[in-house]
Every structure is written in C-alpha cells, then in structure tokens.
Amino acid sequence: KPDLVFSGVKYFNFNNKKVWLNDCLDTHGIPYIASSRAALFNESDKNLAKKLVLKAKIKSADFFITNPEDHQNESSMPISFPLFVKPITGGDSRGVDSSSIVFDFLSFKKKVLEIKTQHNLASLVETYLPGKEYSVGIFEDSIKGTLQAMPIEIIVKKNINGHRILDFDAKKNDEEKVIAVKDKQLFKKLSILAKKAFKALGGKSLGRIDIKMNDLGVPHFMEANFMPGLRKGYFYRSCVLNLGMNYEDMIFNITNTGLSSKEFSKINIRKI
C-alpha cells in the first residue's frame, strides 16, 4: 500500500460511470495530496463554486448560467452589460479569448453559441470586472489546522481591444508576468478572501483561489483550483515569491502535509 498518492487526475470514466480517484483512496485508507472528491466537485463546477462562496458572504460578481436557446432578447437577461462569458467548467482558461468580454446582445449570443459548439458546455456569464487580477496559493498546516495564503499579481498585456484578459493563449504561451503583492493592506484583503473561499468550498492541503478587482478596487472571488499543477505555474510561483521556496522545498512541504493530514505519522523525508 503506498504511503502517499500524488495525482493530477480527479476522476476516470468507466462505462459512462464517473469514478473519483480520491473516493477510492479514502475507502482504502490511502493518504493523498489535495482535497476530497466533494471539494474537487465544488470547485470544478463554477456555478456551484460561486453559489457556495456567495452563501459564505464572500464577494463574487453577479452571474447566471445560460445555453444558446435560453435568452432570445436582452430584456430577458438578469444582469446588464458589459459581461464576461466563459465555460461553466474546465481549466487553463479554455474557451476564454478576446471575445469573452461582451458589450451587446449579438456578441453575447455569438460567444455562448461558440462555447456550446466548441466545448459542448453551458456558459457562465458574469458582470465584467475590469480591475487587476490575482491568484492566491494556499498551504494548509494539517497538524495546526491553519492556512497560509500566498498572493501574487498576474499581469497580462492588453489585447487588440485594449483589455487585459488571462486567456487560453496567454497561459499556453506563458505571456503573463507574475509579481509579488507588496502592499500590506491589499495582501491582507486578498489573503482573508482566499482563506474564506478555500474553507467555504471544503478545500484541504493546498489549492489556489483566483481573484479579480472591480472598478472600485474591491476584490471578488473568480474561481478555485484545488488540484493546481505542481510544475512551475502559479502555485509554485506563489511559493517562490511569498516563502522563498525552491521547487524541491515545495514538494517536500506538500508531501509532509499530505502524510500528516490523514493522521499518519509525519516522516522524515530526506532530500536526495
């Protein structure tokens, strides 16, 4: 039986049945990094995630879920333009591009249809937030039960329409710039929101909370990732900029957290 499972897989599909890996590991008493099946389900469904954080009194942009046939005119829409349109589920900003910000009904219908046609998904439509963008890495101390927040700011260049959008191409081509959050008051605000969102969604061990500012500079929850990539992406960079960790240190920290989180004795892991 393994001491600890590192996995970037949430579930498998067998004969049209979805089998969640962490459910199987829990059944057999095998510790693993990251969150339970329930928490992974909460964050992967962006509609559910926003409902849960709003219920916890955490700010998030007004939103609704739609399919191409749902709204036949602008008056039937529950919130007004400008809006941001993205797939209801999925990572890496898939389905997000320069046309995701919509200012009129025709552009809205076109983007919703595109998401349905290309990704076979409903759209999550929310009030567009024009402010700065942040991501907050979260480390849990499983013994003390405390959370450590590690905010970073993500800066992308303006697109042809003059908007800064962290879209699929920007992530794929590594075009964004990541910097530390040095303003102490802002650091505190981002950390508080991220910790509250992590708890509201049932997170464990580690994760990432994405946040964006509105036009008044008020932070709003955007989405969560409870199975962040362990290569040199945003989670790793949040560790570097906030804790001065190198890659090896980050992996050992995650390993010890994963082992202790299931009430297994913490082991002394030697660096090779």
Residue ranges and their predicted role:
Residues 1-62:
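Conserved N-proximal alpha/beta basic substrate-recognition cap immediately N-terminal to
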Residues 2, 77-80, 214-220:
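A short, glycine/Asx- and small/polar-enriched loop/turn
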Residues 5, 32, 63, 85, ...:
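Generic preference for hydrophobic
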Residues 40-124, 130, 142:
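Active-site nucleotide/adenylate-binding loops and adjacent lid/helix of ATP-dependent enzymes
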Residues 54, 184-272:
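ATP-dependent carboxylate activation and anion-phosphoryl transfer catalytic cores
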Residues 105-192, 213-220:
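Phosphate-binding site of ATP-dependent enzymes
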